[in-house]
């Protein structure tokens, strides 16, 4: 048993979709979350920048004595997961493999869509992961760069969001039966995405799928938390504390969250 917290990282508020599922499935676990809102979105960034920014977040979480790191960000997972895993002696999990595996199980037509940031689509990680498991599946990938900005600006229920989602997803409509939400921001737009794609299309939340793997790893390494009455989840953001709080408290349905501003640029765990 291990009562140290689980660390979650994301380029902004998107990883809160993973945090919500983690809190639901693993209520005894404490969370430390870092969202790099100041440098979001990561999608247009270079591979080198994304890796460097991911290390800033990883080192920040290590300074909080976490027992596991969850890359609750598809872009960071695509670019930096294997690099970080090689360097750390605690479990590190991403969100791409769980999402891909679930989509393979759910599709009936062997036609899967993937929507993600530009960097994730460029990396082709979802396509490669699915191809390794099943060569029979056709994967249609689509970058939706405007989605992250809509979520980060808390415009999910606006008319602009409805128009952007509808226009962005038009190339996939009628061509797939399963759609991977390949960015953890995207579940915050789920109602609009489902409406656009049609109710018959199965939406795969890659972050939610990852929580099942987190549970397996906690058991495997015997680092589950003891049942306890009091502990505090801590959320950190590199910019926009008030906006982050508004989105987090609404999405997690928890009031008075502990949310702080954090400086993580070139963060060194020895600080």
UniProtKB/Swiss-Prot annotation:
A GO molecular-function annotation: glutamate racemase activity
Signal peptide: none
Involved pathway(s): Cell wall biogenesis; peptidoglycan biosynthesis
Keyword Ribosomal protein: no
Origin: domain of life: Bacteria
InterPro entries noted in UniProt: Asp/Glu/hydantoin_racemase, Asp/Glu_race, Asp/Glu_racemase_AS_1, Asp/Glu_racemase_AS_2, Glu_race
Gene Ontology process terms (BP): cell wall organization; peptidoglycan biosynthetic process; regulation of cell shape
EC nos: 5.1.1.3
UniProt keywords, alphabetically: Cell shape, Cell wall biogenesis/degradation, Isomerase, Peptidoglycan synthesis
Keyword Cell division in annotation: no
Residues holding substrate: 10-11, 42-43, 74-75, 184-185
Catalysed reaction, written as an equation: L-glutamate = D-glutamate
Catalytic site positions: 73 (proton donor/acceptor), 183 (proton donor/acceptor)
Function: Provides the (R)-glutamate required for cell wall biosynthesis.
Protein family membership: Belongs to the aspartate/glutamate racemases family.
Name this polypeptide is given: Glutamate racemase
Organism from which the protein derives: Lactococcus lactis subsp. cremoris (strain MG1363)
């Amino acid at each position: 048993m291990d009562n140290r917290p689980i660390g979650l990282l994301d380029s902004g508020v998107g990883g809160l979709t993973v945090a919500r599922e983690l809190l639901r499935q693993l209520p005894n676990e404490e969370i430390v979350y870092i969202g790099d809102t100041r440098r979001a979105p990561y999608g247009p960034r270079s591979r080198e920048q994304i890796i460097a920014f991911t290390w800033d977040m990883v080192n920040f979480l290590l300074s909080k004595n976490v027992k596991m790191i969850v890359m609750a960000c598809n872009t960071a997972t695509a670019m930096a997961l294997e690099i970080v895993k090689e360097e750390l002696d605690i479990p590190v999990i991403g969100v791409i493999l769980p999402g891909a595996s679930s989509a393979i199980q759910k599709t009936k037509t062997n036609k899967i869509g993937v929507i993600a940031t530009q960097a994730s689509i460029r990396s082709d990680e979802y396509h490669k992961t699915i191809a390794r498991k099943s060569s029979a599946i056709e994967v249609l990938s689509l970058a939706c760069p405007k989605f992250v900005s809509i979520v980060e600006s808390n415009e999910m229920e606006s008319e602009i969001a409805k128009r952007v989602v509808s226009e962005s997803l038009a190339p996939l409509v009628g061509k797939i039966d399963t759609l991977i939400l390949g960015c953890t921001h995207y579940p915050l737009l789920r109602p609009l995405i489902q409406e656009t794609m049609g109710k018959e299309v199965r939406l795969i939340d890659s972050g939610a799928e990852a929580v099942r793997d987190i549970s397996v790893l906690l058991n495997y390494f015997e680092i589950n938390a003891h049942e306890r009455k009091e502990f505090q989840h801590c959320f950190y953001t590199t910019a926009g504390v008030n906006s982050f709080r508004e989105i987090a408290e609404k999405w997690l349905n928890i009031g008075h969250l502990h949310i702080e501003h954090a400086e993580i640029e070139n963060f060194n765990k020895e600080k």
